[in-house]
């Protein structure tokens, strides 16, 4: 349940999380106590995203970590008895590195990847518009996580998708900033003001929170199926720095320190090599590692790029032979696919092997389209509902014109989600054959079945 909390003004400048006052979250904050003594930390992660890291239509999901292991180790060195971290506030900022009113928009998910079901995992869902140059959402997750939890880096995950982002390769069109205010503690944190609610909205600018129904998902959909194949962007650490933000009037209350970690996409060093379906890019170890970060799988320091060919190789080898090479984002494994999907994949493997050739790649642009049609993105599809293409489905069901008074889409009937209702108007069930075809399209991509696309595409 999303609850609007204290209203605040989004900070001007380049650090939105700095505008979140710790006194709005914790009751024991006072001018006479330093934030460092209270173990309160502000961090910001800046990612420059290239078109290569965004699927053909601009639909690309990227899992973004929010806490470096080096930060945790520094806290443990200072106080060995520390056991938990409390997520006090989170800011998501998507900045356009191009002219205003260019018609670029998108969606953002904030979720806890440790959950099994979609409705329990989802923290925030919002649609953003970059016509004004930037979009920001500030929220309070308001829950603690054990520092020993192997899913610590997955407890807050951010996935971003873009629409109508028609940039040439080797340019940086988007900057994504993820800021967080967290507090480390030993055994029990009793000073949290809001003790009964998690995930309440603090402020939004050019971002409209949406109900789960707007994305065509159901409460019992499996997160392992919906997000297991989120393709992560390999990043390179550029630099880290520490900002000092004045507190109080004229800085009379001291300065707030905000650590900033800046990253760039590892794709920028790949030259003009363009990823093609069925041909994974070979990335050096330096491009796959972000120093200071640790994924859920301890053997992988940072997630690499998940390609469709990896999935196809897994299908050829079989589930029992996938091995460690199938590890993808944040410790996920291809072994987690459902038995239903695996059955469909195996049945259609022969048809795929005898299918049509790969489409040509245009100069300066990646092409995954069907001639004469608007390009559809096969990189990720909703596998929890029948007859659903994520690219077209999100465009169809995320209409901000159908928002209620609290900016949540209103639906007739169904359960209440975030103050709004969702019903049958969102998900349109279709026949089994349509479902089979969409499973095939998800697994192998429409270029393998260019003349056998479902009518909805």
Curated annotation (Swiss-Prot):
Name of this protein: Putative movement protein
Protein species of origin: Apple chlorotic leaf spot virus (isolate apple)
Keyword presence, Translocase: no
Family recorded in the similarity comment: Belongs to the tobamoviruses movement protein family.
Region (Disordered): 265-284, 293-312, 345-457
Keyword Transport: yes
Disulfide links within the chain: none
GO molecular function: serine-type endopeptidase activity
